[in-house]
A protein has these predicted regions:
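C-terminal and inter-domain tail/linker signature
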Residues: 1-127
Length: 127
C-alpha cells in the first residue's frame, strides 16, 4: 500500500468512527502530531507525542465540533510524505484544512502536522 492509499484508508476509518482500527493499524506508537498554536489556546494546539496523547486530543473533537466530517479533495506525495487538502465540516463550520503526514517503514503514520482553519473552528466550537 503506498502512502496515498494508506492515507485514504486512515481518513475512511476516521470518518466511520472506527478509531480502534485507525489507531491500531494506521498510527505509529511514537507518532508526533503537531497542531500549530500555543498549547491551551485552541483545544487541539500543541505537540502531541505518542499514540495515547493523540487519542486524548482527538477524543475532544465530537463534543466540541458536533457532526465533524472530513472529505479528501486531493493529495500529493513524495516518497513517504503526503499532503492532503481536505473539506472540513461540522455544525456551523464549512472550510478547508491541509494535513501533512510522514509514514514509517512499517506503513504507519509517524508524523502529522495539521494546517486547519482555526478561526472557523473557534467560531463553530460548542461551548
Amino acid at each position: 500500500m503506498d502512502v496515498k492509499e494508506q492515507t485514504r484508508k486512515a481518513y475512511e476509518l476516521f470518518g466511520k468512527g472506527d478509531m480502534e482500527t485507525f489507531f491500531n493499524d494506521m498510527i505509529d506508537d511514537n507518532i508526533v502530531w503537531t497542531f500549530p498554536g500555543k498549547e491551551g489556546v485552541h483545544p487541539l494546539s500543541g505537540v502531541h507525542k505518542g499514540k495515547q496523547a493523540m487519542m486524548a486530543a482527538m477524543s475532544k473533537i465530537p463534543a466540541i465540533w458536533p457532526n465533524f466530517h472530513l472529505k479528501i479533495l486531493d493529495m500529493i506525495s513524495e516518497g513517504n510524505k503526503v499532503f492532503v487538502r481536505v473539506h472540513a465540516t461540522a455544525d456551523n463550520m464549512d472550510t478547508m484544512f491541509g494535513h501533512y503526514f510522514e509514514s514509517s517503514v512499517e506503513g504507519k503514520t509517524k508524523v502529522m502536522m495539521t494546517f486547519d482553519d482555526t478561526l472557523s473552528m473557534f467560531n463553530a466550537m460548542k461551548k
